[in-house]
Regions:
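Domain-edge interaction signal
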Residues: 1-171
């Protein structure tokens, strides 16, 4: 993340820890399903829970940054065909999915962070997959990044991009 990036403090957690915590909020896997489905918009076959987890991580990162002016985690996002992904979460979804239990979750000790993530999860899980994907597809950061390479890195912390998110959230 170079260029017009804002000065960022190091994040306390990594994306896998946040992903594991999100998965723990859905112990019966009613939301983060490990099933294959055809994407309504792109017609690609996706793993529903993996798609939802990555979209949720992206939206939570944006909301967290706007509220606290720091990143929740430092992992890079990439603009892919079906939206935003964190490569390590995307490629290790199955192991994250099956290994989540209280012993394997990196402790997120900060109650404020846990509350923030829980509130976001409870709100975002009410949105359809189509709504989650349409957010990515209408996000200027995704549209300006998608198609530049086989794995285009998203630079959402660029001052211009943060300005776009602040405008959207102030409505």
């Amino acid at each position: 993340m170079v260029g017009n990036n804002l000065n960022l403090k190091p994040a306390k957690y990594d994306a896998s820890s946040i992903a594991k915590y999100l998965l723990s909020l859905d112990p019966n896997r009613e939301y983060f399903e490990n099933k294959r489905a055809k994407n309504e918009i792109t017609s690609a076959t996706i793993t529903t829970g993996n798609f939802r987890l990555n979209q949720m991580l992206y939206l939570i990162q944006i909301l967290y940054y706007l509220k606290y002016e720091r990143l929740l985690f430092n992992d890079k996002f990439y603009a892919w065909e079906n939206g935003m992904v964190i490569y390590s979460v995307y490629t290790h979804f199955s192991s994250l999915y099956y290994n989540v239990n209280g012993k394997n979750i990196k402790n997120i000790e900060d109650g404020r962070i846990k509350t923030f993530i829980s509130k976001c999860f409870n709100y975002l899980k009410t949105n359809s997959d189509r709504v989650l994907q349409e957010f990515a597809f209408t996000d200027p950061v995704w549209t300006s990044t998608w198609g530049r390479s086989s794995q285009p890195e998203v630079n959402f912390t660029d001052k211009e991009n943060i300005g776009i998110y602040r405008q959207c959230c102030s409505r």
